[in-house]
Structures are given as structure tokens and as C-alpha cells.
Amino acid sequence: MCTPCCVSQLACCCGSAACSLCCGCCPKIKQSTSTRFMYALFFMLVTVTCVIMMSPTVEMAMREHIPFYSQMCQQLNAGENCSTLVGYSAVYKVCFGMACFFFFFAVFTIRVQNSTGCRAAVHNGFWFFKFVALLACCAGGFFLPNQDQFLEVWRYVGAAGGFLFIIIQLMLLVQFAHRWNQNWSSGATYNKLWYAALALVTLVLFSVAVGGMVFMFMYYTHPEACFLNKIFLGVNGGLCFIVSLLAISPCIQTFQPTSGLLQPAVITLYVMYLTFSALASKPIEMVEDEIKGNITVCVFPFKSGLKSDTNIVTGVGTAILFCCILYSCLISTTKRSSAALQVYRNDMPENERARCCFCWVDDTEDYDDEKTSGGQNVKYDERDGTVYSYCFFHFVFFLGSLYVMMTVTNWFHYDNAKIERLLEGSWSVFWIKMASSWVCLFFYMWTLVVPMLFPQRFQA
């Protein structure tokens, strides 16, 4: 069994064969899924490297536990204690290499319509050579001339790409909310229990959102300070209430019969999350107390002195952040989700079946399996045509690379950025997250009113 598996992996690394696991008892995997998983693996590998580069804790641990650390840095000409391989400038250079890698493949795979051509073969295989190319791109960033000028220009390129990635992410969320309601509403036509599921989930989502708002009023407002927090909490809460009423208004339901409260519940919960994230990223405020002196107000409890919790919260927050990035990069390129980048159409497929995990349903039909000797079976689902846009897939990962770069280096507060201080306050991060909440609400309101404004374009 070992020899056939090695041959299969060699064909994957050095040829156009799809990658698969060596264990034959593993579930079948589609070629399109295998390819996207491998690119996601590349992406996460570089992302973890960037996190390590921004962590003084990891740098100190390596210095203490690797006996030849100083000698290795000297051999690599990386400066004293590898100073050129850590910090925000190193992250900029590594992410520049990853962005160049995905941008090249985005251009290389333009208008690829089937998997039989040589460009599709390169996209779906030759993983060893692509891994070497990725390493070369990331290393090449350290040899660019005019480093200071490069970092200055690349910072603004990264900010523009990061903003565009945020917009795509928000459009995906709006499309996800519509698809969820559409899928479960279709189930109610043959099983009324789906109505109960809709009502229960809607109630839970609104309850969590309201609870989150109460929590923020408790911890992020103060009678004598934090007036900006009060304004934004009131504005976002009011906007969420307005879009919820708008979603069930007769004028909207005339053009979108499936519009209900589930979509605004999803949007409201996400807006409350963005609001919380923005307020948590805001610089701390202090007021003068007659008894205690200057005290910190409008912060989460762990920021008031319980520093032992900071690393835990930062670690969990970072993990959630990168999971969301990875989900956005992978899901945005499927045929179903690519509709999110267009104006939403309220058309119900005739064969729509309600599913609890509807978002993971493949766009492809059943295909014949191709046996992989000694390993996992692969379904070559792209023989008749591609099931996702190769070019757009790489473009989203290109934008994701820029978003990771800006997030890990704390956007425009990069000089003293550390991964352990990812959740500490800065005005740039605050305004980015607060603006994201408004953009999300705008996108959802637009999908509600545009069929009413342009009815001729949305007729079945």
C-alpha cells in the first residue's frame, strides 16, 4: 500500500493529478475541493509565518532555546538576532511575495473554461513546484531595492486591497443571509417544521444581538465619558431596527415574497459583532474619580488590569479572524456564492431542498469516481467544465493576502505592532470596523429596495 500511495503523491506534487490522502477509507474528494484546499494550506502556512514574525514572545523563545540562533542569523545575513526577519517590515515583504504568487495565477488563469488545458493542469497540480515558487516569492521580497520607499507604497496598496476584501466579505454575508432564508423557506412547502426552525433560529439570533447590545451599554458607556460610544450604539441599534421593519414591510414583500426576519437577524447579529469589535479596538478613555483617582472606563474587563487574560483573548480572536478570512476566500469563489457580487435576485430554484448545512452543498452533479490505488478516491468533477472561476479564486486570495498583512500589522499603527497586542486600541482599526458595519447595513438595504426600484430587471 505504501508504494502506490507514494506514486500517487508524486503524481500530485510533480504532475497534474489531484491531491488525495493515502488512507483508502477516507471519504471521496472532488478535484475542485482538493485544489482549493491545497491553496488554502499555502495561504495558512504563510499566515502563520507572519503571525510568528509579529510575536516578540516567539522570537524570545527561539533565542533562548535554539543554541545556534545567533550564528544562524549571521550566516543568513539577517542582522543581529535576525532583526530583518521579524517585525512589520518582514511581514510586508512576505505578504508581498504571497500576493504576487496569487496575482500571477489570477492573470495566468484568466478565461480558463475547462480542466483539460495546460493552464488548468498547472492550476490543479504540480504542487511541489508551486510551493517552491511561493517560497521564492516570499524570500524575494527581502531583496527588493529601495526598501523604505517600497514599504511606504506597499502600505497603501495593502490598505486598498484590504478594504476591497472587507467589501467582498460583507457582500458574502448578505448573500448568505438571503440563501439561508430562501433554503429553509423552500422546506416549509413540504414540511411545516421548517417554519418552526426559522422562528426558533430568528429568535435566538435576535436575542443574542440584543444581549450583546445590552452588554456593550454596560461595559462601553459611562455617565461622564464615552459619548462617541453612546452615539454609535444608538445609531447602529436604530439602523438594525429599521432594516428589520423594512424586511417585513408589504412593499418589500410584494417583490420579495421570501423576505422575512431571518435575514435581518443575521445582519443585526453581525453588525453587533462589528460594533463590539470596533469599541474594543478604540483607545481607552480615563475619567477622574474623587476616591480612586484616574480610572479607565469603557473597556472590556480584562483591559482594566487582568493582563493574564489578554493573551488568551488575543489568541482566540486571532483564530476566529483567520477562520473568517479562509471561509471568505474559499466560499466566495463557488458558483452559488459568486452571485453575491451581483445584485441579489429572489429566484427560487425548482429543485431547492432545505438542508441544515445548505452552505456546504456542492454546485456539481455526481461524477464517476476514479480509483486511486492505495488511497482516497478522487472525483474529477471538472471534465465538462470548471465549477468555479480559477481567476477570481486567486484574486480573492490575493486580496486576502493584503488583508492579512494589514490586520497582523495593525493597519496604520504598524511601528509598535505586536501580535500579542492585536486587540489593543487604535483609531484606524476602530473606524475601519465601524465603517464596515455601516457598509454591511447598506448592502442589505440595497438588496431589499433594488427589486422595487427596478422591477423589470427582477421579473421571474
Swiss-Prot record:
<feature type="topological domain" description="Extracellular">
    <location>
        <begin position="178"/>
        <end position="197"/>
    </location>
</feature>
<feature type="topological domain" description="Cytoplasmic">
    <location>
        <begin position="413"/>
        <end position="433"/>
    </location>
</feature>
<feature type="topological domain" description="Extracellular">
    <location>
        <begin position="1"/>
        <end position="36"/>
    </location>
</feature>
<feature type="glycosylation site" description="N-linked (GlcNAc...) asparagine">
    <location>
        <position position="114"/>
    </location>
</feature>
<feature type="transmembrane region" description="Helical">
    <location>
        <begin position="198"/>
        <end position="218"/>
    </location>
</feature>
<feature type="transmembrane region" description="Helical">
    <location>
        <begin position="260"/>
        <end position="280"/>
    </location>
</feature>
<feature type="transmembrane region" description="Helical">
    <location>
        <begin position="125"/>
        <end position="145"/>
    </location>
</feature>
<feature type="topological domain" description="Cytoplasmic">
    <location>
        <begin position="146"/>
        <end position="156"/>
    </location>
</feature>
<dbReference type="Pfam" id="PF03348">
    <property type="entry name" value="Serinc"/>
</dbReference>
<feature type="glycosylation site" description="N-linked (GlcNAc...) asparagine">
    <location>
        <position position="183"/>
    </location>
</feature>
<feature type="transmembrane region" description="Helical">
    <location>
        <begin position="37"/>
        <end position="57"/>
    </location>
</feature>
<keyword id="KW-0444">Lipid biosynthesis</keyword>
<dbReference type="InterPro" id="IPR005016">
    <property type="entry name" value="TDE1/TMS"/>
</dbReference>
<feature type="topological domain" description="Cytoplasmic">
    <location>
        <begin position="219"/>
        <end position="230"/>
    </location>
</feature>
<keyword id="KW-0325">Glycoprotein</keyword>
<feature type="transmembrane region" description="Helical">
    <location>
        <begin position="434"/>
        <end position="454"/>
    </location>
</feature>
<feature type="topological domain" description="Extracellular">
    <location>
        <begin position="252"/>
        <end position="259"/>
    </location>
</feature>
<dbReference type="GO" id="GO:0017128">
    <property type="term" value="F:phospholipid scramblase activity"/>
</dbReference>
<feature type="topological domain" description="Extracellular">
    <location>
        <begin position="455"/>
        <end position="460"/>
    </location>
</feature>
<keyword id="KW-0594">Phospholipid biosynthesis</keyword>
<dbReference type="GO" id="GO:0005886">
    <property type="term" value="C:plasma membrane"/>
</dbReference>
<comment type="similarity">
    <text>Belongs to the TDE1 family.</text>
</comment>
<feature type="topological domain" description="Cytoplasmic">
    <location>
        <begin position="281"/>
        <end position="311"/>
    </location>
</feature>
<keyword id="KW-0399">Innate immunity</keyword>
<feature type="transmembrane region" description="Helical">
    <location>
        <begin position="90"/>
        <end position="110"/>
    </location>
</feature>
<keyword id="KW-0812">Transmembrane</keyword>
<keyword id="KW-1208">Phospholipid metabolism</keyword>
<keyword id="KW-0443">Lipid metabolism</keyword>
<feature type="transmembrane region" description="Helical">
    <location>
        <begin position="392"/>
        <end position="412"/>
    </location>
</feature>
<dbReference type="GO" id="GO:0008654">
    <property type="term" value="P:phospholipid biosynthetic process"/>
</dbReference>
<keyword id="KW-1003">Cell membrane</keyword>
<keyword id="KW-0051">Antiviral defense</keyword>
<dbReference type="GO" id="GO:0016020">
    <property type="term" value="C:membrane"/>
</dbReference>
<keyword id="KW-0472">Membrane</keyword>
<protein>
    <recommendedName>
        <fullName>Serine incorporator 5</fullName>
    </recommendedName>
</protein>
<feature type="topological domain" description="Extracellular">
    <location>
        <begin position="111"/>
        <end position="124"/>
    </location>
</feature>
<feature type="transmembrane region" description="Helical">
    <location>
        <begin position="312"/>
        <end position="332"/>
    </location>
</feature>
<keyword id="KW-0391">Immunity</keyword>
<feature type="transmembrane region" description="Helical">
    <location>
        <begin position="157"/>
        <end position="177"/>
    </location>
</feature>
<comment type="function">
    <text>Restriction factor required to restrict infectivity of gammaretroviruses: acts by inhibiting an early step of viral infection. Impairs the penetration of the viral particle into the cytoplasm. Non-ATP-dependent, non-specific lipid transporter for phosphatidylserine, phosphatidylcholine, and phosphatidylethanolamine. Functions as a scramblase that flips lipids in both directions across the membrane. Phospholipid scrambling results in gammaretroviral surface exposure of phosphatidylserine and loss of membrane asymmetry, which leads to loss of infectivity.</text>
</comment>
<dbReference type="GO" id="GO:0140374">
    <property type="term" value="P:antiviral innate immune response"/>
</dbReference>
<dbReference type="GO" id="GO:0017121">
    <property type="term" value="P:plasma membrane phospholipid scrambling"/>
</dbReference>
